[in-house]
Amino acid sequence: MKNPDSKPEAEVIHRERAGEGFLVAAQKDRYSQELLIMGGQLNLKISERDTDGALCVYDATLVSKGGPALHRHQAQDEWFYVIRGEFMVRVGGDTFNLHPGDSAFAPRKVPHAYAMISEGEGQILLLYQPAGSMEEFFHQLSKMGKEIFENPQVALKRLFEEHGMEVIGAPLKF
């Protein structure tokens, strides 16, 4: 017999995975959505809907140097894989310079940041495992537009916290 004072059990949601494989063309998004974030294009390649929330993968094309603030995810691991350009990635106390073909891994709860440090266009794959609410995070971030630049500390801190992340410090300096 169930205790009437006990908390309700969490409902388990089972989503249908894609029944077949799929192709996402170069420079295209899985759902043809355009996410522009701080001058870069973010294309979703594998969605949380494709993997029952197990992971999501983004292809980010950046046109200017820089990257996000030092932060940590409470529930997601993050993997970085460089396709074009040179990137600096900090994970905990280690800093790595990544070139095309190099990758770095940031376990959940470990502070990390990345920045494009080369001239011209750069391209990096970002994988989040599990997906969590990263897709919603990037959609909201892209909608913020100028608000990011007008009051970045307040706007980004709130957005990060709403999606299980914490801003720890400033973006990487190089």
Residue ranges and their predicted role:
Residues T51, M88, R108-E135:
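Ligand-binding loop in jelly-roll beta-barrel domains
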Residues G120-E161:
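A contiguous, mid-protein "functional segment" used to position or interact
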